[in-house]
């Protein structure tokens, strides 16, 4: 219960889904946690549920002004960030021929540009031996129609993680990526489907998962805990898929 005792973690997009579940687990393991989110009401509600060792910052990962000012806001709370989980992301989908420049930019701005410059901005606060986690997707390896811009943005994240692992190895900062498969998170409610179509889509996806269920946010959080802690001290540049075996099927 004390794998992160004395550590401070920053989790972007920590007010819901995977980010919130990870914040809860990190707190259980002794960390102080700073979450970010773009909606003040959602961040406030999350902080109230997390307790006194959690802090919130209103910050939109797709807004470069917010990304640039985030390090200063973090420094008002802590001088050091032992763990950074660049988790904030969006999933905006359309057939390739119907993908607008706005949809393309929205995916890339949040999922890659925001991640890139969030890590760059907070890196001076990360001590030698720190841990950086990035959130990618199994869709990088297995194509799915309508996800071209989204999958490309997450593929860039995965490439970033491998590069940073080499660049930061001299400081013993480990950089690893998590690639979730079908996880029950609020992102599915933002796909623009009617409730009936969403249920049909979910059933079709679940049928293709060897473990025959959607994952829960806590399933991903457990992997984040492993990668953030000393339990994974000899892992860097790695990708861990959390997908119930989905990426191993034809």
Task: Show the residue positions of the predicted features.
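Active-site helix of classical SDR
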Residues: 119, 153, 161
């Amino acid at each position: 219960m004390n794998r992160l005792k004395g550590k401070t973690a920053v989790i972007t997009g920590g007010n819901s889904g995977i980010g919130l579940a990870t914040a809860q687990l990190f707190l259980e393991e002794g960390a102080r946690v700073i979450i970010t989110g773009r909606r003040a009401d959602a961040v406030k509600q999350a902080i109230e549920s997390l307790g006194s060792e959690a802090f919130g910052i209103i910050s939109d990962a797709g807004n470069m002004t917010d990304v640039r000012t985030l390090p200063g806001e973090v420094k008002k709370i802590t001088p050091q960030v032992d763990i950074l989980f660049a988790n904030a992301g969006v999933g905006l989908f359309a057939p390739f021929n119907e993908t607008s420049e706005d949809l393309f930019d929205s995916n890339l701005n949040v999922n890659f540009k925001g991640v890139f410059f969030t890590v760059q901005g907070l890196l001076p606060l990360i001590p030698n031996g720190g841990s950086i986690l990035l959130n990618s997707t199994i869709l990088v390896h297995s194509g799915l129609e309508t996800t071209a811009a989204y999958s490309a943005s997450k593929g860039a994240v995965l490439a970033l993680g491998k590069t940073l692992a080499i660049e930061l190895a001299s400081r013993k900062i480990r950089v690893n990526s998590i690639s979730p498969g079908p996880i029950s998170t609020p992102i599915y409610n933002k796909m623009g489907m009617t409730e009936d179509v969403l249920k049909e889509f979910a059933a079709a996806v679940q049928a293709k998962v060897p473990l025959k269920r959607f994952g829960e946010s806590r399933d991903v959080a457990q992997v984040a805990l492993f990668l953030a802690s000393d339990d994974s001290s000899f892992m860097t540049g790695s990708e861990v898929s959390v997908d119930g075996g989905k990426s191993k099927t034809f």
